[in-house]
Amino acid sequence: MIEALKEIAKQNPQGFTVDLNLNPVTSGYVIAVPETQNCFGDQGLEKVLEIARDNGYCIGGWLNRENGRFYWDASLIVRDLEEAKEIGRKFNQIAIFDLDEQREIWL
């Protein structure tokens, strides 16, 4: 699965979110979970995959344009905006991502 996720990241360098079956998640609000904050490289991907599997989270990745690093996240998908904002704040996130509109929502 690690190699498949790397290939998805290679094909989607600006970012992606997939479920544990590697199907694209295209709707809802993405909230990165704190346990996988600042995960990058192979070691970071392994940690993200383990946490996602253990908790039923989705897996995502995105390119930080400021430092050129590709970050991996285990993510929770929520359908309700207010609930997503509340969880995002609880997780100390500065933003969540709206998959439907393809935009960040700053908290």
Question: What positions do the PLM features span?
Answer:
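Conserved, structured core segments of small domains
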Residues: 1-107
